[in-house]
């Protein structure tokens, strides 16, 4: 059965969207192609008419997650206290408990690092956030300070997600949030 180019393009985007959410929620390695395609009502073999490999899908899914983050961050960084708004959103309970809807860096970065080859897409996602943070900072070393802030946010969110004790998870977010805000004056 032949499908129109429009249908194929829509299916392609559905696969990317679902993969993006699953990679952020479950991890790249834990997301199998067969269950991914089955969840979309598609066959495993049909995957290869859309992508050459899982690695290609990973890059496209990471780009889609980055695009989603760009939209959210544009709103946050347009507020009166943009860095505070970003820190609050990044270290929110919602972001902690809904990784499939959040920044891809905490969930995907460790696996991307273990792949053995850097990802230009992860560089782009990270650099977009660093620029936005840096643009809110005053004084010296704004580039270095933006790296410290983003690294702290990603690390705190990742730690809060990996502990079993919900009180400790909340403390990690709260203490990090307060510390980052205090350090900014």
Which sequence ranges carry the predicted segments?
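A secondary-structure capping/hinge motif
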Residues: 55-57, 108, 117
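Helix-loop "lid/cap" segments that line or gate small-molecule binding pockets
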Residues: 92-95, 105-115
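Hydrophobic alpha-helical connector segments
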Residues: 60, 71-102
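Helix-turn-helix
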Residues: 14, 18-56
């Amino acid at each position: 059965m032949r499908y129109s180019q429009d249908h194929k393009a829509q299916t392609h985007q559905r696969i990317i969207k679902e993969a993006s959410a699953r990679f952020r929620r479950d991890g790249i390695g834990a997301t199998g192609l067969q269950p991914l395609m089955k969840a979309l009502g598609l066959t495993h073999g049909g995957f290869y008419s859309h992508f050459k490999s899982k690695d290609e899908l990973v890059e496209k899914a990471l780009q889609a997650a980055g695009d989603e983050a760009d939209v959210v961050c544009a709103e946050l960084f347009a507020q009166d206290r943009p860095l505070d708004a970003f820190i609050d959103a990044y270290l929110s309970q919602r972001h902690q408990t809904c990784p499939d809807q959040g920044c891809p860096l905490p969930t995907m970065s460790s696996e991307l690092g273990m792949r053995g080859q850097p990802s230009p897409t992860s560089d782009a996602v990270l650099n977009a956030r660093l620029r936005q943070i840096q643009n809110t900072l005053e004084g010296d070393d704004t580039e270095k300070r933006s790296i410290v802030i983003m690294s702290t946010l990603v690390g705190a969110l990742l730690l809060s997600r990996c502990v079993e004790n919900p009180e400790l998870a909340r403390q990690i977010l709260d203490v990090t949030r307060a510390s980052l805000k205090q350090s900014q004056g």
